[in-house]
């Protein structure tokens, strides 16, 4: 088994067979069921963590390799970094970061109360270095837990795809309030034409690039254009916005699994410097 990764600015081109499959699967889930899924979104994620405990996702040790902002507290002794992990799950990204960098303080929140409990039960959890809380990012005000403009970086890693597209902007506006001017949201999520998107069976489609899994959790598959517009409309500036292509090849089985992710950085604009007394008199 081997994995190969590359980056690019264009979405993955589908094979003829893949295109035909997507064309066949155009029927949408009924409006009634879609409303039920939205209403029960938190319950479905809580049940997901009840079934899978902390075993479903692997720890994400790649984040500091891909995002230099998460390494910034290593450059100078005593330099601190304050992070918000929006949608922390059971801590697969959070705890590798806390373990690697003793100068990191993290706020972490999740939609699922059960996931938050798992984070608090983790042997590396330390309330002096991490504040974790339950939060619906589309509705609950982050300022109830995090001071305004106090965070050096926000991670949104495989989080926004689980939110209804009509509510994604609310998440971005919410984290905007706690992010320092000139600092960035670090984003990675499912990209258009990812292998997972093509595996959905007929009857799973909720809307354009939006699907429901059998367990009731939902997933959106992003294009770079859609994501850029979403962030820019919420007041951010685009820094990096590119596709990541990973192919997992099993030569023995003759399998090649094409994964597509979107990896991006969007910056909160820096504040204009206050005018000096000299410039004010001109």
Swiss-Prot record:
Entry keywords, A to Z: Cytoplasm, Methyltransferase, Nucleus, S-adenosyl-L-methionine, Transferase, tRNA processing
InterPro entries linked to this entry: Methyltransf_12 (IPR013217), METTL2/6/8-like (IPR026113), SAM-dependent_MTases_sf (IPR029063)
GO-annotated cellular components: cytoplasm; nucleus
Keyword Nucleus listed: yes
Knocked-out gene: effects: Mice were born with normal Mendelian ratio without developmental defects. However, male show a significant reduction in body weight over time due to reduced energy expenditure. Cells show reduced N(3)-methylcytidine modification in tRNA fractions.
UniProt GO MF annotations: enzyme binding; tRNA (cytidine-3-)-methyltransferase activity
Key word Transferase present: yes
Subunit architecture: Monomer. Interacts with SARS1/SerRS; interaction is mediated via tRNA(Ser) and is required for N(3)-methylcytidine methylation.
Name under which the protein is recorded: tRNA N(3)-cytidine methyltransferase METTL6
Organism annotation: Mus musculus
């Amino acid at each position: 088994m081997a994995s190969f990764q590359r980056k690019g600015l264009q979405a993955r081109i589908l094979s003829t067979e893949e295109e035909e499959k997507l064309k066949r699967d155009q029927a949408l889930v009924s409006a009634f069921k879609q409303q039920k899924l939205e209403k029960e979104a938190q319950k479905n994620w809580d049940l997901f963590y009840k079934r899978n405990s902390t075993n479903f996702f692997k720890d994400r040790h790649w984040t500091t390799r891909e995002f230099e902002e998460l390494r910034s507290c290593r450059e100078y002794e005593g330099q601190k970094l304050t992070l918000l992990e929006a949608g922390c799950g059971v801590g697969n990204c959070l705890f590798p970061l806390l373990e690697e960098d003793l100068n990191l303080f993290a706020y972490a929140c999740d939609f699922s109360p059960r996931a938050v409990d798992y984070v608090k039960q983790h042997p590396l959890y330390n309330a002096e270095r991490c504040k974790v809380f339950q939060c619906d990012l589309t509705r609950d005000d982050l300022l109830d837990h995090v001071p305004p403009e106090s965070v050096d970086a926000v991670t949104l890693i495989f989080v926004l795809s689980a939110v209804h597209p009509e509510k994604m902007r609310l998440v971005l506006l919410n984290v905007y309030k706690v992010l320092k001017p000139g600092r960035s949201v670090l984003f990675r999520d499912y990209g258009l034409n990812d292998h997972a998107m093509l595996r959905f069976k007929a009857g799973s489609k909720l809307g354009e690039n939006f699907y429901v899994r059998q367990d009731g959790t939902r997933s959106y598959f992003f294009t770079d254009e859609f994501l850029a517009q979403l962030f820019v409309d919420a007041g951010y500036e685009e820094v990096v916005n590119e596709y990541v292509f990973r192919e997992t090849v099993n030569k023995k089985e003759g399998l090649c699994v094409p994964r597509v992710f979107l990896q991006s950085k969007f910056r909160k604009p820096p504040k204009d410097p206050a005018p000096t007394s000299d410039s004010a008199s001109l």
